[in-house]
Regions:
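Conserved beta-strand signature within the Rossmann-like core of class I S-adenosyl-L-methionine
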Residues: 153-164
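A short glycine-rich, Lys/Arg-flanked "PGG" loop and its adjoining helix->strand segment in the class I
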Residues: 143-153
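Alpha-helical transmembrane segments of helical membrane proteins, especially in multi-pass transport
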Residues: 136, 140-143
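Class I SAM-dependent transferase core
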Residues: 1-63, 96-111
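Active-site capping/gating segments
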Residues: 163-203
Length: 203
């Protein structure tokens, strides 16, 4: 097992182990994650999702968009269960097979989240304090989703690869926003973009 922070409880570690086992099992049937990443799942998926959670401000409502195979959304739900006042977690996913997996994983890990089976752009604004999305779309598209679903003053968290500066430059053509690149703990070329103040350009 990849090293987890020492403040993660044994119960949470067991829930994360259960999640990874489920991902490995279901990936053989539906395309949850790239099969090549399953063996290195602690680093590629669990730790990568954990850093998203650790970077976020305390939230009353967290929305994970395009949750897919459960990262970071299911990990967020598992970690929030440790908190005295856990956030309401909403997972948005349009693929019904993946929604079935998400509900199964929530049941088997004992985590709590709402699963919305719909396209992100068709979901009524969620008013979330924190919005996250991983490996979903270019930044300019993600900003549109975040602008729709973030509460005023909310934060968006988007893991991005080595070309993140180009994505920021492209997004700045249509959006005003602040972006803080935080070095990834799982990939030296990647960052976690912490974004706020999202507004479309006038006209």
């Amino acid at each position: 097992m990849e090293t987890l922070p020492t403040d993660v409880s044994r119960e949470t570690r067991e829930r994360l182990e259960t999640l990874l086992a489920l991902v490995g099992k279901w990936t053989r049937r539906i395309n949850l994650v790239a099969p090549s990443t399953v063996e290195d799942g602690w680093r590629r998926h669990i730790l990568d999702s954990l850093q998203v959670h650790r970077t976020a401000p305390a939230a009353r409502h967290w929305a994970d968009l395009g949750t897919g195979g459960g990262f970071p959304g299911l990990v967020i739900a598992i970690l929030e269960a440790e908190r005295r006042a856990p956030a309401q977690v909403t997972l948005v996913e349009s693929d019904r097979r993946k929604c079935t997996f998400l509900r199964t994983a929530l049941r088997e890990t004992g985590a709590h989240a709402s699963v919305i089976d719909a396209r992100i752009e068709s979901v009524p604004p969620l008013g979330a304090d924190v919005v996250s999305a991983r490996a979903l779309a270019p930044l300019d598209t993600l900003l549109g989703f975040a602008h729709r679903h973030c509460a005023p003053g909310g934060t968006a968290l988007f893991p991005k690869g080595a070309r993140w500066p180009e994505e920021i430059a492209a997004a700045e053509r249509d959006w005003t926003f602040s972006a803080e690149p935080i070095p990834s703990i799982t990939d030296p070329d990647a960052v976690l973009l912490r974004i706020g103040g999202i507004a479309p350009h006038a006209g």
